[in-house]
Amino acid sequence: AANGNFNGSESKRSRTAYTRHQILELEKEFHFNRYLTRRRRIEIAHALDLSERQIKIWFQNRRMKWKKEHKLPNTKLRLP
């Protein structure tokens, strides 16, 4: 890390590999709701065998992806 004395055995989380089923369910939920209540996050976490934190972060990342995909084109460059 930035401080130079990071050793590999410290608790750096490994990347979560979601199953097709988990992604399908998360995408389905995102289609109806871009934001989750805590209760709904808990329900999804239990149903998909993931942690609340994983659900929360997946939704944060998915919202950023959605935002990038739906960005309005830059109108300054267009000439009449």
Curated annotation (Swiss-Prot):
Residues 21-80 bind DNA. GO terms for molecular function: DNA-binding transcription factor activity, RNA polymerase II-specific; RNA polymerase II cis-regulatory region sequence-specific DNA binding. One of its GO terms (cellular component) is nucleoplasm. One of its GO terms (biological process) is anterior/posterior pattern specification. It is found in: Nucleus. Keywords: Developmental protein, DNA-binding, Homeobox, Nucleus, Transcription, Transcription regulation. It comes from the Eukaryota. The keyword Transcription regulation applies. PROSITE patterns: HOMEOBOX_1 (PS00027), HOMEOBOX_2 (PS50071). Sequence-specific transcription factor which is part of a developmental regulatory system that provides cells with specific positional identities on the anterior-posterior axis. Belongs to the Antp homeobox family. Deformed subfamily. This is Homeobox protein Hox-A4. The gene is HOXA4.
